[in-house]
Amino acid sequence: HHIKVLEEELNVCIFDRSNGKVVVTREGEEVINCAKKMLGLYNSLRQDLSDSRRLVSHLTVGVTHTAESNPIAEALANYGAQNDHVMIKMITGTINKLYSKLKSYEIDLAIVEGRIPDPEIRYLLMDTDYLVLAVSVHHPFAKRAMVTLEELKKERMILRLPSSGTRNLFAAHLESNNQSINDFNVILELDNIATIKDLIRRDFGVSILPRSVCLGELKKKSIAVLPVENLSMVREINLAYQSDFAQTDILHDLVESYQETLRRYQ
């Protein structure tokens, strides 16, 4: 009944009910996206009013699976520990889902690799990261300064899923060298970075990973990393936020907390 009233009020068809199926129309998708944004703003308003009464701030931060595995979680925990008035909730998701949640106000900030051209979204640079070949410390490559693509083709490779930014950056650099992932011996694809690192440590294969996710292992000397010849796979780690985000002082504090956390691994 409510949907029918809404359709009449907006003069659109939200659902196509033909052929015995109920399918969301293009106009319906716009209505749903707008409703999500309104709900996000409403929840944000309720949280802000509650926070102002209790003199605290709630911050929902979305991070990619890569960011979850590097010192960012530690930096957020440090910031929360040092600031009693700030309560942080961290959620993980794919980069596309995080941007969607950011635009519908379901999250306040997103920590992402790279940038997208969107006038509503602002960025603050946190760090510059680069992809490396990660191998077991017992692997013959561990003592090398560099490895070639031809040598890499002879290795068992464990890669992130095709939907990940890490995988896409590697694939793009291969293509610029007239190569393809299909030229390599990929034995396993998975999304969990901790599992990939565990398999590398146990010499099941090698992987292309962001250096930032290997800092703990490098400090413990449980994984070795090295560059791949002709592949300069550099990317930014950015703090993304809506143009109307008001607590800009928190942004710089979070970057400072991240830099402070990084220094512990050096």
Model regions: which residues?
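Short beta-strand->loop
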Residues: 122-132, 214, 219-233
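Alpha-helical linker/hinge and terminal dimerization helices associated
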Residues: 9-10, 31-53, 254, 258, ...
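Secondary-structure junction motif
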Residues: 157-178, 247-248, 255, 265-266
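A late-sequence structural motif
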Residues: 71, 204, 224-266
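Hydrophobic hinge/microswitch elements
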Residues: 94-99, 103-107, 112-113, 175-223
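Central regulatory/effector-binding core of bacterial HTH transcription factors
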Residues: 56-119, 190
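A short LG(V/I)-centered, amphipathic sequence patch enriched
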Residues: 5-24
